[in-house]
């Protein structure tokens, strides 16, 4: 049986890998959950007639080039959109297709480019309508779906804050202010590291200039204390943060807003890599990530990782990782000479090193303060699926819980349909702070990774 490589995830990494394979005449299957490829970075507007000019000329050029390259290789890429991989093992995947039919799909090689999800940071009022995660709001703007009405406030930490503020304003949204939790001096200390990517550094300065020119205030060392409103968001309380992100409540002030977008970084989606039994480790920030080598190979050599699965470093790094993974697959299939594969890999790795140095600087200045876990009050819901509060978690800690598995058993946190995607970040942070240990475990995924209808089992079969 002549099996094909399978790529899970049609974002930057998955598309780059598929293009690389296709250019060598190797056909592949590419699965993506969305209705068009591109991922969060390059999906573009979902509706016809939407002009993405507000996202910037350089972004538009990169989007158009990626689409042209992908279209040119379409004859070798079996693109399966609106399809979810809900489980798998070392030889096959379980896929729910667009018609909600379940299939087993076997593969010769597998590339996991499943991306990431946003880190949720609970605080009083974070479940109010009008409060949303920053990446989700940006995706709505990029997709041309909907724009928030009224005043929008942006809070959190990282380079995504000013970027989204500029994109929102350019799209016609009223941005009331941007609140960056880290102090300006902390960011300035990383200037040399940030200069490893001069264009991105200049883009950052340009965004700051845009905000100033358009009268959008940017507050360093400030963050959210509480969101409030009767049934929906009407007001956000912000305050100065100290180095540990402890809010100075004496100097807190209310800000009127109908939308609050909060962004505190991302966590790789490791549900499938865990089901496949790959080796994992923990990042400095405490999240679980699958391990890979310089060929993007996991602990199982025919399974590769790219994009956020291999480290959260942005779209450019994701594409480089996808290309390296494709070179490894081509090498294993004897579709490329070893010397050429190594030469091209080294060229890609040289570019990747500069990105890694840049990202290391970003990670240092955006490192979350230890007191962030104390923003939530005793009655603040942490696990939205099971309505587990911070008080429930604190009682479990008092009773001697030492790891994620114990916390899940004691409180039901992480037992809902999202399988902990919303609460795992907080639970891990709180356990690490309480126990003083870096490794407190992680939530083990169940099959299926996503909910599926019973009707999906009617036509279950195996597809090569």
Swiss-Prot record:
EC numbers, comma separated: 1.4.99.5
Signal sequence extent: none
GO MF term (any one): glycine dehydrogenase (cyanide-forming) activity
Thermal properties: Not stable at 0 degrees Celsius. Decrease in activity up to 40% immediately after freeze-drying procedure, with a further decrease up to 10% when stored at -10 degrees Celsius.
InterPro entries assigned: BFD-like_2Fe2S-bd_dom (IPR007419), BFD-like_2Fe2S-bd_dom_sf (IPR041854), FAD/NAD-bd_sf (IPR036188), FAD/NAD-binding_dom (IPR023753), Metab_Enz_Cyan_OpOx_G3PDH (IPR051691), Opine_Oxase_asu/HCN_bsu (IPR017224)
Keywords: Cell membrane, Membrane, Oxidoreductase
Record-level GO cellular component terms: plasma membrane
Activity dependence on pH, as recorded: Optimum pH is 8.3 (in the presence of Tris-HCl). Active from 7.3-7.8 in the presence of other buffers.
Localization (cell): Cell membrane
Activity regulation annotation text: Oxygen is necessary for cyanogenesis. Activated by succinate, glycine methyl ester, glucose and D,L-methionine in addition to glycine. Phenazine methosulfate, methylene blue, 2,6-dichlorophenolindophenol (DCIP) and ferricyanide can replace oxygen for the reaction. Inhibited by pyrrolnitrin and acriflavine at 1 mM concentration.
Reaction equations catalysed: glycine + 2 A = hydrogen cyanide + 2 AH2 + CO2
UniProt induction comment: Reduced oxygen levels.
Function: A three-component membrane-bound flavoenzyme that catalyzes the formation of hydrogen cyanide, a secondary metabolite, by transfer of electrons to a cyanide-resistant branch of the aerobic respiratory chain.
Oligomer and partners: Heterotrimer of HcnA, HcnB and HcnC.
Protein name: Hydrogen cyanide synthase subunit HcnB
């Amino acid at each position: 049986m002549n099996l094909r490589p399978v790529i899970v995830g049609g974002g930057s990494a998955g598309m780059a890998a598929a293009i690389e394979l296709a250019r060598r005449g190797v056909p592949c299957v590419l699965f993506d959950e969305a209705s068009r490829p591109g991922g969060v970075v390059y999906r573009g507007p979902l509706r016809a007639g939407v002009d993405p000019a507000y996202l910037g000329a350089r972004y538009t050029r990169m989007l158009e080039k990626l689409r042209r390259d992908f279209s040119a290789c379409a004859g070798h890429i079996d693109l399966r959109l609106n399809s979810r991989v809900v489980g798998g093992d070392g030889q096959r995947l379980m896929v729910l297709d667009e018609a909600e039919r379940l299939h087993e799909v076997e593969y010769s090689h597998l590339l996991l480019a499943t991306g990431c999800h946003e880190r949720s940071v609970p605080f009083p009022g974070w479940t109010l309508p009008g409060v949303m995660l920053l990446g989700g709001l940006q995706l709505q703007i990029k997709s041309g779906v909907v724009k928030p009405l009224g005043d929008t406030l942006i809070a959190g930490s990282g380079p995504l804050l000013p970027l989204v503020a500029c994109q929102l304003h350019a799209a016609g949204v009223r941005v009331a202010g941007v609140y960056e939790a880290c102090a300006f001096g902390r960011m300035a200390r990383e200037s040399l590291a940030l200069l490893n990517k001069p264009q991105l550094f200049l883009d950052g300065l340009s965004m700051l200039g845009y905000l100033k020119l358009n009268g959008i205030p940017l507050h360093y060392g400030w963050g959210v204390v509480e969101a409030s409103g009767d049934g929906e968001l009407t007001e956000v309380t912000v305050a100065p943060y100290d180095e540990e992100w402890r809010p100075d409540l004496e100097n807190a002030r209310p800000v009127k807003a109908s939308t609050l977008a909060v962004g505190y970084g991302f966590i790789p989606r490791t549900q499938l890599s865990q089901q496949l039994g790959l080796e994992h480790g923990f990042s400095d920030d405490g999240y679980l990530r699958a391990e890979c080598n310089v060929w993007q190979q996991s602990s199982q050599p025919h399974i590769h990782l790219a994009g956020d699965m291999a480290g959260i470093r942005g779209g450019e790094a994701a594409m480089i990782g996808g290309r390296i993974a494709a070179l490894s697959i081509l090498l294993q299939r004897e579709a490329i000479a070893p010397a050429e594969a190594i030469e091209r890999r080294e060229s890609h790795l040289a570019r990747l090193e500069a990105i890694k140095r840049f990202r290391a600087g970003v990670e240092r200045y955006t490192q979350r303060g230890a007191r962030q876990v104390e923003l939530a009050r005793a009655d603040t819901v942490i696990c939205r699926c099971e309505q587990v509060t911070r008080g429930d978690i604190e009682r479990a800690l008092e009773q001697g819980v030492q790891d994620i598995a114990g916390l899940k058993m004691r409180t039901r946190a992480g037992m809902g349909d999202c399988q902990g995607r919303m609460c795992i970040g907080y639970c891990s942070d709180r356990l690490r702070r309480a126990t003083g240990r870096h490794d407190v475990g992680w939530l083990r995924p169940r099959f299926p990774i996503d909910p599926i209808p019973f009707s999906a089992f009617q036509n279950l079969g195996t597809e090569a």
